[in-house]
């Protein structure tokens, strides 16, 4: 079905707005998936705060102009679904969602992802997918900071016990 110019402009504006607020974007080929499978993907995306769109490639290229995701334009070939991580707390959510979905749906193929001005092709999308969310990152930081303090505490206790045993 042919889209009217007004409809195309609206789609470009919507995608451009989401892209300008997103921290990461993922591009995947959905050819061969059923409507039911795509609906499942979209439901999971909503749960994670990920925005997904199926847009014509030329419209996506126009929408990406002036955003950090214009570096993905070379990957906009064939049937394409876009995923955007818009949550500051979980910047890798879209990549993680698409990667997990690709594991269970062989027809779903990751093309590329963009994060922080860099493009990750195919299997390298896992770099973004493995980014910890904010809670996990803070937990990792706390454990790294806690380890030296624990060692110091054990050292002081050992020295105290040694001094007590020598005094006795």
UniProtKB/Swiss-Prot annotation:
Keyword annotations of the record: Ribonucleoprotein, Ribosomal protein, RNA-binding, rRNA-binding
InterPro entries according to UniProt: Ribosomal_uL10, Ribosomal_uL10-like_sf, Ribosomal_uL10_bac, Ribosomal_uL10_bac_type, Ribosomal_uL10_CS_bac
Signal peptide positions on this chain: none
Pfam families hit by this protein: Ribosomal_L10
UniProt GO cellular component terms: large ribosomal subunit
GO aspect biological process, one term: translation
Keyword Ubl conjugation: no
A GO molecular function held by the record: large ribosomal subunit rRNA binding
Function: Forms part of the ribosomal stalk, playing a central role in the interaction of the ribosome with GTP-bound translation factors.
Subunit description: Part of the ribosomal stalk of the 50S ribosomal subunit. The N-terminus interacts with L11 and the large rRNA to form the base of the stalk. The C-terminus forms an elongated spine to which L12 dimers bind in a sequential fashion forming a multimeric L10(L12)X complex.
Record-stated family: Belongs to the universal ribosomal protein uL10 family.
Name of the protein: Large ribosomal subunit protein uL10
Organism: Acinetobacter baumannii (strain ATCC 17978 / DSM 105126 / CIP 53.77 / LMG 1025 / NCDC KC755 / 5377)
Lineage, opening ranks: Bacteria, Pseudomonadati, Pseudomonadota, Gammaproteobacteria, Moraxellales
Gene: rplJ
